[in-house]
């Protein structure tokens, strides 16, 4: 079976989304959160579907909505048995650095929670590599670098820190720079993700993504690594189970 380590399940199609995944041998979906509301939604989904597990956290684009008074609510959610990680958290300077200090402050709050509850973290990092690395080094956490798109040098830094690299639909894009990275790292350090409903793999690029597309990403990875799809499935599933303690 496959595991989708990173999805945002649309609530209006949740039943068909999960069923489509199961039909395509994607038997576990780890649903991410972007704020307090979606954290509650994610936990509700996990409580509804055996195949779904939840992460809770605040995405860097939503830090202005975060209130410190929300922390007890996140702590309560983290005690739910189906919450397997803190995420999606991190830093995003793509649109500028005007809220950089606030992003870093909120990022640190959730890294502290991850330490406190012994949970892995799911990291969003865009145009913020060095800040992300330096801050992560201050905490005793491991996890997944979501939608990894950096250089081989950066990949090796994260790997040495104990992180897995989340590889998704971008790998299937023509002229993807990820080709050279995945060829030069071990599959022991890779997990598969869709980031549904975003970043659909070819030939569905531009259409809403679903967890059912994980095997397409796996097939692409198997070709680049020169190994069987079954080996990709078994190893990435084992990696996902290891980091999420499934």
What positions do the PLM features span?
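Mid-domain alpha/beta scaffold segments of enzyme catalytic cores
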Residues: 1-246
């Amino acid at each position: 079976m496959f595991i989708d380590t990173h999805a945002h399940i649309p609530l209006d199609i949740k039943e068909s989304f999960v069923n489509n995944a199961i039909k395509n041998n994607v038997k576990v979906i780890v649903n991410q959160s972007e704020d307090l509301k979606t954290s509650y939604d994610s936990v509700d989904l996990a409580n509804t579907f055996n195949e779904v597990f939840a992460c809770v956290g605040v995405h860097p684009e939503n830090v202005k909505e975060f209130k410190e008074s929300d922390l007890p609510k996140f702590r309560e959610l983290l005690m739910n048995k189906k919450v397997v990680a803190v995420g999606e958290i991190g830093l995003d300077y793509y649109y500028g650095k005007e809220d950089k200090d606030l992003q870093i402050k909120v990022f640190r709050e959730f890294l502290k929670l991850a330490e406190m509850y012994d949970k892995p973290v799911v990291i969003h990092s865009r145009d913020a590599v060095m800040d992300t690395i330096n801050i992560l080094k201050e905490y005793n956490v491991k996890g997944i670098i979501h939608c990894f798109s950096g250089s081989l040098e950066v990949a090796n830094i994260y790997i040495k820190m104990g992180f897995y690299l989340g590889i998704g639909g971008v790998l299937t894009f023509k002229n993807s720079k990820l080709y050279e990275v995945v060829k030069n790292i071990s599959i022991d350090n890779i997990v598969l993700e869709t980031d549904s409903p975003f970043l659909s793999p070819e030939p569905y690029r531009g259409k809403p993504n679903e967890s059912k597309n994980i095997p397409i990403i796996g097939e692409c990875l198997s070709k680049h690594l020169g190994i069987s799809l079954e080996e990709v499935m078994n190893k990435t599933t084992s990696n996902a189970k290891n980091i999420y303690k499934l």
